[in-house]
C-alpha cells in the first residue's frame, strides 16, 4: 500500500469505450501522477522514427498485435525516465507475458479495473457518427444531429467509422476480454486488483478517487488539495 514518501506504481484497465482514456487523464491530473499511455508512446515513437516504432508499425499495418517483447521493451524504456515519479500505466500491460515482465522490474501497488457492461459500451460506441471533413462528432443518444445522418452546419452526410460499427465493436470487445482476462486473474491472485463496476463513468469516478486517496502518498496529495 502507498505510504507517505513512497512512489505509487499503478495500472488502469478497461475495455475500449469504458471511459479509461478520459479517466486516466483526470486521475493523473488530480493526483499529479505521470500518465504513461501505450497509444501515446507508440505515436510519439513513430513521429521520431525510432527502430522499435518502425517494427511496431509493420505489425499494425498487417492488422497484427505488436509482439509482447517489443511492447514491453518500449514501455520499460520509457519508465526508466520516470524512476522518481509516481505513475499510472494505461494500455500496458495488455497480456500476461507483459504483466509478468513488468513485475520483474517494478512492484505494482494497485490495478484499477473499470468494469462497464459490454452492452452499455456497445451502445455508447455505435451511437457515434462523424462529419469526415470537419471531424465533428455526434452521438445519437447525447448529442444528436438536427436531422438524422446529416451534419448540422454543412448539410453533408455523416459517416460511422469502421471501428464504431456494431460488428467491429463486438469483435474488439471479445478480443479485449480474451486478451486481458488472464491479466486480471494474475493481479487478482497478487491481491492488487480493485474493480469498479457501473454503467456511467461519472458515477464510477468518485469511487476510484476515494480509493486512490488512500493509496497515493501524502506528499503527492498535498499539491492537489492546495487551492
From Swiss-Prot:
- Domain of life per record: Eukaryota
Q: Where is this region: NMP?
A: 37-66
Query: Which Gene3D superfamilies did the record assign?
Result: P-loop containing nucleotide triphosphate hydrolases
Please give the residue positions where the record annotates the modification Phosphoserine: 37
A Pfam family this chain is assigned to: ADK
Q: Which UniProt keywords apply?
A: Acetylation, GTP-binding, Kinase, Mitochondrion, Nucleotide-binding, Phosphoprotein, Transferase
Q: Which residues bind AMP?
A: 38, 43, 64, 91, 94, 98
Q: Which GO terms describe its molecular function?
A: adenylate kinase activity; ATP binding; GTP binding; identical protein binding; nucleoside triphosphate adenylate kinase activity
Which stretches of sequence are listed as region LID? 127-164
In this chain, GTP is annotated as bound at 17, 19-22, 128, 138-139, 161, 172, 201
The protein's name is GTP:AMP phosphotransferase AK3, mitochondrial
Q: Present the record's domain note.
A: Consists of three domains, a large central CORE domain and two small peripheral domains, NMPbind and LID, which undergo movements during catalysis. The LID domain closes over the site of phosphoryl transfer upon GTP binding. Assembling and dissambling the active center during each catalytic cycle provides an effective means to prevent GTP hydrolysis.
A Gene Ontology biological process noted in the UniProt record is:
AMP phosphorylation
The record's family statement is: Belongs to the adenylate kinase family. AK3 subfamily.
What cellular-component terms does GO give this entry?
cytoplasm; mitochondrial matrix; mitochondrion
